[in-house]
């Protein structure tokens, strides 16, 4: 699967495809916008443009009749038409603005929904900052394109074509001269647009990379500070800031040159046309009123042509955003509801000859087989990096085995819907995730239905967490801060255990939390875990000797393989490495 720079290269290589009408329409359809607003906005823009096109046509006879006096009524009508055109154009801008906001709202909702349904392996290879950039910057770029650039380009093209049509009716020779000059201007525009397209893609990719680095450092700000790594973090970001600066300079040069070059080309063309018009007047082919009317149409062209050119520039800049969003929405996501619903209680969990590797990298697990009988405790022990946590990831179905299968009561777990499976699995890790919000919100996170305060206090009791929650100023409504920074490590663990009690899982997975806790917190957490394990099928990554001794079966894992299994006393007698590991590595619990 292509990610990061590979994705950027892939998009750059297919820029034309990604900005094609087919892909663009696909992206807009995904947003499900309010098409009525778009239609009303475009129609209002068309009406405003048509009114604007009528004004120069009315000026022609008005000027030619000045020799017989000023017609106040016609002058007032011309002014009224200008005001009417401005009013209708304002209405069009407002309606299209609302349309654009509806598009970006729906698109962000769709992109966010897609992100949270992507498999875990996607997030292993894409920085969160890049994902945030897709959600914020790329969607805004698309909104600007469809709410501003496209409608303005549409009305400008209408103004351009309408002006040319009326000019042909008024004086075809002068208009023909302009039609000959237009391709010259387009030849000047083409290389500029190509350069703008390249800058736009590079800018979006660099910005996403910078946001990824910033998000990573800020999310781990305590590590940054405790490690005195501020200089390192600044230097790491400095390269990306400098890269963005260089791209910004190129973009500034591009934006700075774009308008003057286009305006110069337009003015040279217009000057030549005006000179030719004066010549036609001098030969009696054209009247002064016709020339003034033509000049007003030319003023329309001066405004319309740069707008059309800017549209192509914005389209070029948005090509990277459009490509990334389209590719993201095309990613295969997890299907939560596909499969059977099965009650896991009282059923045997088994793994048979399971292998696993991340993509094409070195194999992590080799020929893993184990069995967990109902209500039994299965312990996984072994040196760090052996693959114990990977087994848990496979059980949570974050990844698929590359060989072998995992079954429940003889049935492959892939046959069970993800939602049903995960709703019956509970996991408490060494550093359990706590979300920003209240204690109440964290306890009920991911659960449907209403829970009374009594329900919550009951699970807090079971997790030995009631006392510290009662002592907090707002109790269940206390804010715990981002990632639970306002509470201690032991308190976070006990809240996670209380959350697991509330979920009432049929299969429990534990990564014993001992290393980062003081002895008192560890004792409280262990009591809560012991209570949680009762009456459930439990798989535990063991760090305590008491857990090893109490386990119904132990699997010793080293370098991705099970090298021994059995009860504690059996392994001590038959497995020298296990005996050494127990004596040197495990915490002795009371």
UniProtKB/Swiss-Prot annotation:
SMART domains: AAA (SM00382). It is found in: Cell membrane. Pfam families: ABC_membrane, ABC_tran. One of its GO terms (cellular component) is plasma membrane. ATP binds at residues 382-389. Residues 349-584 form the ABC transporter domain. One of its GO terms (biological process) is response to antibiotic. The chain crosses the membrane at residues 35-55, 79-99, 150-170, 176-196, 261-281, 292-312. It catalyses: ATP + H2O + xenobioticSide 1 = ADP + phosphate + xenobioticSide 2. Residues 38-317 form the ABC transmembrane type-1 domain. Keywords: Antibiotic resistance, ATP-binding, Cell membrane, Membrane, Nucleotide-binding, Translocase, Transmembrane, Transmembrane helix, Transport. Its EC number is 7.6.2.2. GO terms for molecular function: ABC-type oligopeptide transporter activity; ABC-type xenobiotic transporter activity; ATP binding; ATP hydrolysis activity. It is a multi-pass membrane protein. Efflux transporter for a variety of amphiphilic cationic compounds, including antibiotics. Homodimer. Belongs to the ABC transporter superfamily. Multidrug exporter LmrA (TC 3.A.1.117.1) family. This is Multidrug resistance ABC transporter ATP-binding and permease protein.
């Amino acid at each position: 699967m292509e990610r990061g720079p590979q994705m950027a290269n892939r998009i750059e290589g297919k820029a034309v495809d990604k900005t094609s009408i087919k892909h663009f329409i696909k992206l807009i359809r995904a947003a499900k916008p309010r098409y009525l607003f778009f239609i009303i906005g475009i129609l209002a823009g068309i009406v405003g443009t048509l009114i604007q096109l009528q004004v120069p046509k009315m000026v022609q006879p008005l000027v030619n009749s000045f020799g017989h006096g000023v017609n106040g009524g016609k002058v007032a009508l011309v002014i009224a038409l200008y005001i009417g055109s401005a009013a209708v154009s304002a209405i069009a801008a407002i309606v299209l603005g609302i349309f654009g906001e509806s598009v970006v709202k729906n698109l962000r909702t769709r992109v966010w929904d897609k992100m949270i349904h992507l498999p875990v392996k996607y997030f292993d290879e894409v920085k969160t900052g890049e994902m945030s950039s897709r959600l914020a910057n790329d969607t805004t770029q698309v909104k600007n394109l469809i709410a501003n650039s496209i409608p303005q380009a549409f009305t400008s093209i209408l103004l351009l074509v309408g002006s040319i049509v009326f000019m042909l009716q008024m004086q075809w020779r002068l208009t023909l001269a302009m039609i000959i000059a237009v391709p010259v201007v387009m030849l000047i525009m083409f290389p500029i647009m190509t350069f703008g397209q390249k800058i736009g893609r590079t800018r979006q990719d660099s910005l996403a990379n910078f946001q990824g680095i910033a998000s990573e450092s800020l999310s781990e700000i305590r590590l940054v500070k405790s490690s005195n790594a501020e200089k390192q973090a600044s230097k790491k970001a400095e390269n990306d800031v400098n890269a963005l600066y260089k791209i910004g300079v190129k973009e500034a040069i591009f934006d700075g040159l774009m308008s003057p070059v286009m305006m110069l080309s337009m003015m040279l063309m217009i000057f030549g046309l005006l000179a030719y018009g004066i010549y036609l007047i001098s030969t009696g082919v054209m009247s002064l009123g016709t020339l003034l009317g033509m000049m007003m149409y030319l003023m329309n062209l001066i405004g319309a042509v740069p707008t059309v050119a800017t549209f192509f520039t914005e389209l070029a800049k948005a090509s990277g955003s459009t490509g990334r969003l389209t590719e993201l929405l095309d990613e295969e996501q997890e299907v939560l509801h596909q499969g059977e619903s099965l009650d896991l209680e009282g059923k045997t969990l088994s793994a048979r000859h399971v292998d696993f590797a991340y993509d094409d990298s070195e194999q992590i697990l080799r020929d893993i087989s184990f069995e967990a009988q109902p209500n039994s405790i299965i312990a996984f022990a072994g040196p760090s990096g052996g693959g114990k946590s990977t087994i848990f990831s496979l059980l949570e179905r974050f990844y698929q085995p590359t060989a072998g299968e995992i079954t429940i009561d003889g049935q492959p777990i892939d046959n069970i819907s993800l939602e049903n499976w995960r709703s019956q699995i509970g996991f408490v890790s060494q550093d359990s995730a706590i979300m920003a919000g209240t204690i109440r919100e964290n306890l009920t996170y991911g659960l449907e239905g209403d829970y009374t305060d009594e329900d919550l206090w009951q699970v807090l009791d079971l997790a030995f967490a009631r006392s510290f929650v009662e002592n907090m100023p707002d109790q269940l409504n206390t804010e715990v801060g981002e990632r639970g920074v306002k509470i201690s490590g032991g308190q976070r663990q006990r809240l996670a255990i209380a959350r697991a009690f509330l979920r009432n899982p049929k299969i429990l997975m534990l990564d014993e939390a001992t290393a980062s806790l003081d002895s008192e917190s560890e004792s409280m957490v262990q009591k809560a875990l012991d209570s949680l394990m009762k009456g459930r099928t439990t798989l535990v990554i063991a760090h305590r000797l008491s857990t090893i001794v109490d386990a119904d079966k132990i699997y010793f894992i080293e370098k991705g393989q099970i090298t021994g299994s059995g009860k504690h006393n059996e392994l001590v007698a038959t497995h020298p490495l296990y005996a050494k590991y127990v004596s040197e590595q495990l915490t002795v619990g009371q």
